[in-house]
Amino acid sequence: MACARGTVAPPVRASIDVSLVVVVHGGGASNISANRKELVREGIARAATEGYKILKAGGSAVDAVEGAVTVLENDPEFNAGYGSVLNVNGDIEMDASIMDGKDLSAGAVSAVRCIANPVKLARLVMEKTPHCFLTGHGAEKFAEDMGIPQVPVEKLITERTKKHLEKEKLEKGAQNADCPKNSGTVGAVALDCRGNLAYATSTGGIVNKMVGRVGDSPCIGAGGYADNNLGAVSTTGHGESILKVNLARLALFHVEQGKTVEEAAQLALDYMKSKLKGLGGLILVNKTGDWVAKWTSASMPWAAVKNGKLQAGIDLCETRTRDLPC
């Protein structure tokens, strides 16, 4: 397959049978340093494999995206959960969301501090409350009520994120977040054997952000969207730009208009870039299992599993493929 700029998609399907599909991303960002690339590649492949295992075992699309994103939240190479970037005060504030395309159920949390896996809390918001979104202290109180253990913030902070904040302060000055060099987010989309779709997105946000800043990741329609009639999307990139164009739902609008997944992703990202100069990326799977990973940022770690075949990459036209054990 020829590789266009920032685009990865599988070969054309041979049939319209529902296939199990998981696609994950590790965030649209500036170029990843050579000494981290293999760790990032391994982490993203591990997450996709975990999501696919859940589907193979009969789990739902929601189970799969939660499982895949949890793997990435637990990996310090990614900006979510353990290893989240720090705000202007050197603290962690994390956001996450999840959505079930079967009935449009959704849950989200923002500005949570002492939770190792915000995606799990977002799912509990979806399933255990009448609400879609909890934030800050309210979200943390809900986590306590649900029996989710609190984790001291210092245990979620890494030496790399401390150095990242110091470097950002020196280079840009506090609060200057117009065009962050690292807009790392993690996300997953999945299609299960019952034809249900889901997405999940999780992030630590933008390094050196103002206290209380919330980006696109927990916002349904911006950070992600899932509808069984259309597809599932998880986005990454400059959060303020993604919010302004409602990037996830915009991509699915183009699917609704009859565009292929690749065309839909390209149109949505091009609009954000032309209108706002906003860079980013997205992963999308439609109701028949066609998927795409597309980005306008310098790189976007991604991995996908379909029909037992794992594909993964980071940079343009750099894809590794292997068969998973049966």
Curated annotation (Swiss-Prot):
Q: Which Gene3D superfamilies match?
A: (Glycosyl)asparaginase (3.60.20.30)
Where along the chain is the active site annotated? T185 (nucleophile)
Modification after translation: Cleaved into an alpha and beta chain by autocatalysis; this activates the enzyme. The N-terminal residue of the beta subunit is responsible for the nucleophile hydrolase activity.
Q: Where in the cell is it found?
A: Cytoplasm
Report the Pfam families cross-referenced here.
Answer: Asparaginase_2 (PF01112)
One GO cellular component this record assigns the protein to is: cytoplasm
Q: What is its EC number?
A: 3.4.19.5, 3.5.1.1
What InterPro entries has UniProt attached to this entry?
A: ASRGL1_meta, Ntn_hydrolases_N, Peptidase_T2
Give the EC class as a word. hydrolase
Catalysed reaction(s)?
Answer: L-asparagine + H2O = L-aspartate + NH4(+); Cleavage of a beta-linked Asp residue from the N-terminus of a polypeptide
How is expression of this protein distributed across tissues?
Answer: High expression in the heart and brain while low to minimal expression in the other tissues. In ocular tissues, high levels is observed in the optic nerve and retina while relatively low levels of expression are detected in the iris-ciliary body, lens or retinal pigment epithelium.
Listed GO biological process terms: asparagine catabolic process via L-aspartate; proteolysis
Q: Which GO terms describe its molecular function?
A: asparaginase activity; beta-aspartyl-peptidase activity
Q: Which domain of life is it from?
A: Eukaryota
**Cell membrane: present as a keyword of the record?**
no
Q: Which CDD domains does the protein's record reference?
A: ASRGL1_like (cd04702)
Tell me which residues bind substrate: R213, V214, G215, D216, T236, G237, H238, G239
Keywords for the protein's UniProt record, in alphabetical order: Autocatalytic cleavage, Cytoplasm, Hydrolase, Protease
Assembly with partners or alone: Heterodimer of an alpha and beta chain produced by autocleavage. This heterodimer may then dimerize in turn, giving rise to a heterotetramer.
Please give the family membership noted in the entry. Belongs to the Ntn-hydrolase family.
Q: What does this protein do?
A: Has both L-asparaginase and beta-aspartyl peptidase activity. May be involved in the production of L-aspartate, which can act as an excitatory neurotransmitter in some brain regions. Is highly active with L-Asp beta-methyl ester. Besides, has catalytic activity toward beta-aspartyl dipeptides and their methyl esters, including beta-L-Asp-L-Phe, beta-L-Asp-L-Phe methyl ester (aspartame), beta-L-Asp-L-Ala, beta-L-Asp-L-Leu and beta-L-Asp-L-Lys. Does not have aspartylglucosaminidase activity and is inactive toward GlcNAc-L-Asn. Likewise, has no activity toward glutamine.
Protein name from the UniProt record: Isoaspartyl peptidase/L-asparaginase
Native organism: Mus musculus
Which gene is transcribed and translated to give this protein? Asrgl1
